[in-house]
């Protein structure tokens, strides 16, 4: 069978396991910010390349897809509690593997010994934990890249999808849904047939949308609206599906579902 359409994000996720005190999904933005700070600081190439940093050398935002960071939470089963079990480094599709390895390998493993490197992540009241490359032969389901990239027609959000603007008026939900369809096109996926927005996720263990801090607009432009989403395509697509304005920072992460509206895993 021909391969299902994918997005600008590579489905070969690099998974980092988290150790330490429980970190819950609403800490996503804080956690990805701490990870990004760490990566930028210890990248062997300084200043870090555009695909890694998301910025050109002059400091302006890049126009090309770049490294995204996303939480991998314990969700989608009966006892799921939404805690973050790991983080994924999501590379842009088409990035040269040697180039990626040159920047990431020394961060993940000690260049002298080849042993895994553990890095602390800390943010005051939010979390205190450590991350390390996940290398177990049989990873827990939520740390298995397949769980997040499996081909599926229906996807449901685990972290809220940030809308590109605030919608008013009686048709605001239709217009907001259309904007999420456009956001899927924007990452190289086909335009979905249907998008349903709701403050509650379809997936067990995922917190209500209002429990997640809102993404702030750049230059003090206020808070951005967000909501959970169910996205239905005409044909199966391959993940990861990261959509909306927060997609490089862990918002808009969706999970493949089967046709019955149950978790695919």
Residue ranges and their predicted role:
Residues 1-265:
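RNA-interacting cores
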């Amino acid at each position: 069978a021909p391969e299902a359409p994918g997005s600008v994000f590579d489905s070969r996720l690099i998974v980092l396991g988290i150790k330490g005190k429980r970190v819950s999904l609403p800490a996503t933005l804080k956690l990805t910010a701490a990870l990004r700070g760490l990566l930028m600081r210890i990248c062997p190439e300084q200043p870090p390349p555009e695909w890694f940093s998301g910025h050109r050398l002059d400091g302006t935002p890049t126009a090309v897809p770049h490294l995204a960071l996303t939480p991998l939470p314990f969700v989608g089963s009966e006892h799921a509690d939404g805690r973050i079990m790991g983080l994924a480094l999501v590379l842009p599709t088409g990035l040269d593997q040697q180039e990626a390895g040159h920047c990431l390998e020394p961060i993940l493993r000690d260049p002298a010994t080849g042993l895994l490197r553990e890095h602390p992540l800390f943010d005051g009241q939010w979390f205190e934990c450590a991350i390390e490359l996940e290398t177990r032969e049989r990873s827990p389901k939520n740390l298995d890249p397949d769980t997040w990239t499996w081909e599926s027609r229906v996807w449901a959000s685990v972290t809220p999808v940030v809308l590109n603007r605030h919608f008013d008026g009686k048709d605001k939900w239709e217009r907001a849904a259309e904007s999420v369809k456009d956001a899927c096109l924007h990452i190289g996926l086909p335009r979905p047939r249907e998008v349903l927005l709701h403050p509650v996720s379809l997936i067990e263990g995922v917190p209500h949308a209002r429990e997640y801090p809102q993404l702030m607009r750049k230059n003090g432009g206020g808070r951005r609206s967000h909501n959970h989403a169910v996205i239905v395509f005409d044909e199966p697509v391959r993940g990861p599906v990261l959509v909306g304005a927060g997609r490089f920072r862990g918002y808009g992460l969706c999970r493949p579902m089967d046709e019955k509206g149950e978790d695919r895993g």
